Swiss-Prot record:
Keywords: 4Fe-4S, Iron, Iron-sulfur, Isoprene biosynthesis, Metal-binding, Oxidoreductase. Dimethylallyl diphosphate binds at residues 41, 74, 124, 225-227, 269. [4Fe-4S] cluster binds at residues 12, 96, 197. Catalyzes the conversion of 1-hydroxy-2-methyl-2-(E)-butenyl 4-diphosphate (HMBPP) into a mixture of isopentenyl diphosphate (IPP) and dimethylallyl diphosphate (DMAPP). Acts in the terminal step of the DOXP/MEP pathway for isoprenoid precursor biosynthesis. Binds 1 [4Fe-4S] cluster per subunit. This is 4-hydroxy-3-methylbut-2-enyl diphosphate reductase. It is an enzyme of class 1 (oxidoreductase). The keyword ATP-binding does not apply. It comes from Mannheimia succiniciproducens (strain KCTC 0769BP / MBEL55E). Its cofactor is [4Fe-4S] cluster. One of its GO terms (molecular function) is metal ion binding. Pathway: Isoprenoid biosynthesis; dimethylallyl diphosphate biosynthesis; dimethylallyl diphosphate from (2E)-4-hydroxy-3-methylbutenyl diphosphate: step 1/1; Isoprenoid biosynthesis; isopentenyl diphosphate biosynthesis via DXP pathway; isopentenyl diphosphate from 1-deoxy-D-xylulose 5-phosphate: step 6/6.
Amino acid sequence: MKIILANPRGFCAGVDRAISIVELALEIHGAPIYVRHEVVHNRFVVNGLRERGAVFVEELNEVPDGAIVIFSAHGVSQAVRQEAKNRNLKVFDATCPLVTKVHMQVARASRKGTKAILIGHEGHPEVQGTMGQYDNPEGGIFLVENVEDIAKLGLKDNEELTFMTQTTLSIDDTSDVIVALKAKYPAIQGPRKNDICYATTNRQQAVRELAEQSDLVIVVGSKNSSNSNRLAELASRMGVPAKLIDDSNDIEPDWLKGINTIGVTAGASAPEVLVQSVIARLKELGVDSVEELEGCEENTVFEVPKELRIKEVG
């Protein structure tokens, strides 16, 4: 029995940056540091930061006046930013720059009064933050999750429309929705390149390659991680059993019955240490060799805010 490792896998530049912001804020300012929402969707990472003094909250009313608060990698609405300002909170923004790029598209549409359609998953914090960039009562922003939702929009074919997408979606599903949007609204405008981020795209492509060579695919990632769920769904769609696990403790020996090749990958918010523990556990269960796909190299780096950078360099 052998393992094939996906490449790339695990942390992306936005996650790296977000975790660094919390770590550096704790180092410079000391605990407690408040973080609005889980800074990234990974239980292991969040628990580690909590042990060091990060306090995770869902709303700013849980943060004392004048305290330090970090916005998670998923981004926040304009209303949350304004509330932080009104409360005199010291903010470090860990919003992924690729999410911020989508925020700017929405804000531009809002200023022009152009109606916007966001392709994304209802209730996901990134979607909440992105929709919260639109504040023009003359226009409006509408959420669609799938092709069926487009029929319910009730917008006129001839009105000025623009669309954007959540950054962690399935490339295939999103492509289908965009095709349907353009068919219903031929004049609709959108980004020159889709908003799905490079890391999501690369990890989905790696899982395609992995699934072609595997009898079982294991995705390391938390259940609330959008991009991790999409990786497991993609493998399943290709006809390969897929398991989404938080860590090696979730592995059930029965999964390996009749299996020769196990593909292993990790979502963009899952650290490599978890992948290595999964490999160790699978070796205990009979794996005798580990290979790695060649994949593509990722060199993207996002800098932390300058107030934290001085300490990092020093």
